[in-house]
Each structure stands twice: as C-alpha cells, then as structure tokens.
From Swiss-Prot:
Belongs to the POA1 family. GO terms for molecular function: phosphoprotein phosphatase activity. The keyword DNA repair does not apply. The gene is POA1. This is ADP-ribose 1''-phosphate phosphatase. Its EC number is 3.1.3.84. It comes from Chaetomium globosum (strain ATCC 6205 / CBS 148.51 / DSM 1962 / NBRC 6347 / NRRL 1970) (Soil fungus).
Length: 185
C-alpha cells in the first residue's frame, strides 16, 4: 500500500467558522506563549485549550518539544461559553522561541514535517481511543506569520511528507488527508 499524504487546498475566510469535530492546526513556539498573530486569536477563542498548551510546554524543555505536536481535545470550559466550538486544536512545535529569538526559517521547516506526522499519529490514536472521528482538518498558513517562513515553503514540506502506519487519521480518503489552509479575508 502506498504511504498516505497530505493534500493542501488554500482558501480565504474564517479558519474558526468550522463545524464541531474539526481539527484546527497552527504552528507554535515551545515556551507556552500564544501572544501574537493567529496564536493570539486561538488564545482568545480557546482559553482552556491555551492552559493545556501552556502546561504542556512547562513540563518539557524547548529542545524536547520542537518537531513534535500536541493534540488538545475540546475543553469543557471552552464549550460552555468562552468561544470554543467543539474543535480539536493541533499545535505544531516548529520554533523553540518567538519574536526576534525565533528559530531561523530552515530550522522551522525541518521541524514542520516531523511535527505534522506526530500530530497525525496523535489524531489517529485519539480516534481509536474515543471512537470520535475528526471530520475536517483546517489550518492557518502555518509558519508564514510571525515565524516569517514563506507559506509556499511550508506547504511544499507538508505535501512532500509521507504518513506511515499509525499516522493516518480516519478522515483520510484513498491515502490522502485533505487539509484546508485558511488565509484571512
């Protein structure tokens, strides 16, 4: 059987206007800060999920986290009125730090594929464990904002990677995981 791959389609609109059980992916630093750009929008819409992310970062060193991912299931606090819509949050740890201390673009790109493969494995494991199927996969144009990596470079890196056994979520059709990359209108 051929390895599974991601197929990324670009769209313009609201990343967060998604049905329940959608996976929303963004690139993150490893120090527990969602303080600017799209990460700040995630923090404002998903405060309980932000606390899970921050605690995860506090338990590890930046070098341990870079190139990995965190899957955050919908948190009850977000579902009860603070903005969350029953969305899973996928955090790709592609840079150790943020701002002027962010990793250089080549290092961020080297971390992007392994982080996405790890996230797909976490999604497959979550689906197996809970019986809940992720219905849709969305992401922002990862790394292209405050990490200053050209979107086309990240997109190429993601579409070139192969998903192995245990890394293919249930939403894959014919060996392809459809991912919609959203850019704000």
């Amino acid at each position: 059987m051929s390895p599974a791959r991601l197929r990324i389609t670009d769209r313009t609109g609201d990343l967060f206007a998604a049905p329940a059980n959608t996976l929303l992916i963004h690139a993150c630093n490893t120090v527990g800060s969602w303080g600017g750009g799209i990460a700040l929008a995630f923090r404002n819409l998903y405060p309980a999920e932000f606390r899970v992310y921050r605690a995860h970062c506090a338990r590890s060193t930046p070098n341990q986290l870079v190139g990995t991912a965190l899957l955050i299931a919908p948190q009850r606090a977000s579902l009860n009125g603070s903005g969350g819509g029953g969305h899973y949050i996928g955090c790709l740890f592609t840079s150790r730090r943020f701002g002027a201390a962010r990793d250089p673009p080549d290092r961020i790109l080297r971390a992007t594929g392994p982080a996405m493969r790890h996230l797909m494995r976490l999604v497959a494991e979550e689906e197996e464990r809970t019986g809940v199927r992720i219905g849709e996969v969305r992401m922002c144009r990862i790394n292209a904002g405050l990490f200053a990596v050209p979107w086309e470079s990240s997109k190429r890196a993601l579409e070139a990677m192969e998903l192995g056994d245990g890394e293919v979520p249930g939403c894959a059709q014919g060996g392809v995981v459809e991912v919609v990359a959203w850019e704000r209108a």
